[in-house]
């Protein structure tokens, strides 16, 4: 029986969780599911440009585990791009760390004050990502908004 996976720390929940090729009806597409921690690995390494050791530390895993997560994520993204598949970001074994909130409208990120208003300080939008299930204890997650399993 395999060991349960180590809970991964994630600092960011995406505002958009579905990507598909243009001009192809959804019903005709195959789908690739990218776990939240796989997206986090791509964000840390490819978007922020951190070294693998730093990425692993931020996610709370060993460097070899980080490399496996990153390689799995890159393989899924490449499969979707090369073969014209949709990408759905959902699920995984993670907990959200840090109080950062991201505005889904303008992309601004900030650390809200305790008891502060739940709206973007830049554009005033109340459409926020980064609040909700996933903080604290680690759980296996399904789709966003379905809670913890």
UniProtKB/Swiss-Prot annotation:
Residues 129-149 are annotated as: Disordered. Disulfide bonds: none annotated. Belongs to the UPF0251 family. This is UPF0251 protein Moth_1655. It comes from Moorella thermoacetica (strain ATCC 39073 / JCM 9320).
């Amino acid at each position: 029986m395999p060991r349960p996976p180590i809970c991964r720390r994630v600092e960011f929940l995406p505002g958009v969780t579905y990507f598909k090729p243009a001009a192809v009806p959804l019903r005709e597409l195959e789908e690739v599911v990218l776990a939240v921690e796989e997206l986090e690995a791509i964000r840390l390494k490819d978007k922020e440009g951190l070294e693998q050791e730093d990425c692993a530390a931020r996610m709370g895993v060993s460097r070899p585990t980080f490399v496996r997560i990153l390689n799995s994520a890159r393989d899924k993204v490449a499969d979707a791009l090369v073969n014209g598949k949709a990408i759905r970001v959902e699920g995984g074994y993670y907990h959200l760390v840090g109080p950062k909130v991201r505005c889904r409208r303008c992309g601004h990120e900030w650390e809200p004050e305790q008891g502060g208003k739940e709206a973007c300080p830049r554009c005033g939008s109340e459409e926020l990502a980064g609040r909700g299930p996933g903080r604290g204890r680690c759980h296996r997650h399904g789709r966003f908004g379905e809670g913890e399993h």
